[in-house]
């Protein structure tokens, strides 16, 4: 399997990667993935906690090896990245409904600073963003959606704090 991503950069610099690990977490990209079943999400987080415990032990023991379950051929990764970067990361895919209460959580928490509040509503001021959907997941009234909203509205919201029993921010 060809080396992709940051591992290729290490190899180009003459550095070796001794180990890599995979921790499966709930995928929060609700354009595709469904997080509406809270029990499934809780089970996924429980498995992740177990994997983290195993990972800590492996790191303590300085184990070497490839512990990742998921890899894709390089050409598939390039095609998916081109689609994602070319169309899916465009902020024009994000919209806000009249349910917006102007709380500003979306703008305050956007890691890309792609959102500004105008007339108490979010406006995406950058053409692209990381499309983390943090704005969508934090909106207390579910007013932010991707595309036509059918998938993201039906697939639920996720913040780790919600499942960790902490205040969601």
Please give the residue ranges for each predicted region.
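FMN-binding flavodoxin-like domain, especially the glycine-rich phosphate-binding loop
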Residues: 1-83, 154
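Short alpha-helix boundary/capping motifs
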Residues: 34-39, 138-139, 167
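Short amphipathic alpha-helical segments at helix-loop
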Residues: 36-40, 88, 92, 121
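A mid-sequence, solvent-exposed acidic-amphipathic segment
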Residues: 71-104, 108-111
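Iron-sulfur cluster-binding cysteine motifs and their immediate structural context
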Residues: 96, 105-124, 134-151
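Long, positively charged, glycine-interspersed low-complexity recognition regions
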Residues: 142-169
């Amino acid at each position: 399997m060809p080396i992709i991503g940051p591992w290729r950069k290490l190899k180009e610099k003459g550095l070796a990667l001794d180990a890599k690990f995979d921790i499966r977490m709930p995928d929060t990209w609700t354009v595709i993935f469904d997080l509406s079943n809270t029990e499934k999400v809780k089970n996924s987080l429980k498995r992740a906690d177990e994997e983290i415990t195993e990972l800590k032990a492996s790191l303590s023991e300085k184990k070497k090896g490839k512990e990742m379950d998921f890899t894709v051929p390089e050409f598939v990764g390039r095609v998916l990245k081109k689609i994602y970067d070319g169309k899916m990361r465009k902020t024009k895919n994000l919209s806000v409904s009249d349910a917006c209460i102007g709380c500003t959580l979306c703008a305050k928490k956007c890691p890309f600073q792609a959102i500004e509040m105008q007339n108490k509503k979010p406006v995406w001021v950058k053409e692209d963003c990381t499309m983390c959907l943090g704005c969508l997941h934090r909106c207390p009234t579910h007013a932010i959606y991707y595309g036509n909203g059918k998938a993201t509205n039906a697939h639920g919201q996720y913040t780790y704090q919600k499942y960790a029993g902490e205040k969601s921010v």
